[in-house]
């Protein structure tokens, strides 16, 4: 069934109602904050944001007698937007409720544009981004490459994870193996696992230990199943593939941070079908394709668009087999999706 198109007046009315609701929620939140800060608050202490629920977050105490305990906290209005993985300074109040008073500097942040083109942080202080895909739904190199560019741009090390390896068969193996070979040749770490059968899961756990990781990938690739296998007590709800579309149904509703027994953390984020890169420039995209780095700057023309220009180093590398057609197609698709002012 086709999605109903809204006219300008309907969109305006929806935004007006949402704005009024947000204003009422903010007013209620401010009243709660005033009551909390007017009472007895404990000393400032360090905390870790492990989940975000709109105007409130769950914070795990990092020091003191309450270390390891989780508190629901309100945010002061002057704070920037917080995300799972943020390190904060907070003060405990009554009845297990606290107030966040400061945000600690982030070592990294993973961002994506929202529907209005504004940057929205997804997770903070991550040092490993696990890009999950599977034989079904059919993996798209373009989406994988978008994640890789985002990881390179954010300075976060990527790990390519093929889940549902038990679904590889004679029909899909040739295409899948050809796609994987491209990434192996580029030197990207790649692991094949099956959360359902347990194959490769021990190796995955070893690769995650000691890192703050985030799982990304389109819906239906088994991110929640992976979390349930790695952390049986997490209780992440699992969704099936939609029979009609073959795409996954979104199950995780908020990003949450989990601890591994041997050290390291995992942030399980909602399924993302299309990872936008509107916040990066053409230069950022070119730098995100690691095999392009030694070639960029060697073209005959400084403003080369790597399309049909004579003396293009990228086109020559493509012709010689140094750059794969798969990656070149992804690059062109990503560049075409950028706003014109990013050129």
UniProtKB/Swiss-Prot annotation:
Residues 116-275 form the CP-type G domain. Keywords: Cytoplasm, GTP-binding, Hydrolase, Metal-binding, Nucleotide-binding, Ribosome biogenesis, RNA-binding, rRNA-binding, Zinc. GTP binds at residues 163-166, 217-225. It is found in: Cytoplasm. InterPro entries: G_CP_dom, NA-bd_OB-fold, P-loop_NTPase, Ribosome_biogen_GTPase_RsgA, RsgA_GTPase_dom. Binds 1 zinc ion per subunit. Its main location: cytoplasm. It comes from the Bacteria. Zn(2+) binds at residues 299, 304, 306, 312. One of its GO terms (cellular component) is cytoplasm. Its EC number is 3.6.1.-. One of its GO terms (molecular function) is GTP binding. Pfam families: RsgA_GTPase. Belongs to the TRAFAC class YlqF/YawG GTPase family. RsgA subfamily. This is Small ribosomal subunit biogenesis GTPase RsgA.
């Amino acid at each position: 069934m086709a999605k109903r198109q809204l006219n300008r007046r309907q969109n305006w009315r929806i935004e007006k109602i949402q704005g009024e609701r947000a204003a009422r929620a903010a007013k209620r939140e401010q009243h709660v904050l005033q009551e909390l800060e007017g009472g007895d608050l404990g000393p400032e202490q360090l905390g870790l944001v492990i989940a975000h629920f709109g105007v409130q977050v769950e914070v795990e105490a990092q020091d003191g007698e309450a270390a390891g305990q989780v508190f629901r906290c309100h945010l002061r209005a002057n704070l920037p937007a917080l995300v799972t993985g943020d390190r904060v300074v907070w003060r405990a109040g009554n009845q297990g409720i606290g107030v966040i008073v400061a945000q600690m500097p982030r070592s990294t942040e993973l961002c994506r544009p929202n529907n209005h083109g504004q940057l929205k942080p997804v997770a903070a202080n991550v040092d490993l981004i696990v890009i999950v895909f599977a034989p079904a739904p059919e993996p798209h190199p373009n989406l994988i490459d978008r994640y890789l560019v985002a990881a390179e741009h954010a300075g976060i090390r990527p790990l390519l994870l093929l889940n549902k390896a038990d679904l590889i068969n004679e029909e899909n193996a040739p295409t899948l193996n050809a796609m994987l070979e491209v990434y192996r040749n580029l030197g990207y770490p790649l692991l094949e696992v099956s959360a359902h059968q347990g194959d490769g899961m021990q190796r995955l756990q070893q690769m995650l230990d000691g890192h703050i990781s985030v799982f990304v990938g389109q819906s239906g690739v088994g991110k929640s199943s992976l979390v349930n296998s790695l952390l049986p007590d997490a209780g992440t709800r699992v969704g099936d593939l939609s029979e009609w579309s073959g795409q996954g149904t979104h199950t995780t509703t908020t990003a949450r941070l989990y601890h591994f027994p041997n050290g390291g953390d995992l942030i399980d984020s909602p399924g993302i079908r299309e990872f936008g890169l509107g916040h990066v420039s053409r230069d950022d995209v070119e730098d995100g394709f690691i095999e392009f780095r030694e070639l960029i700057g060697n073209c005959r023309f400084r403003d080369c668009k790597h399309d049909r220009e004579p003396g293009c180093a990228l086109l020559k590398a493509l012709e010689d087999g140094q750059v794969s057609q798969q990656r070149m197609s992804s690059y062109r698709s990503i560049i075409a999706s950028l706003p014109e002012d990013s050129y």
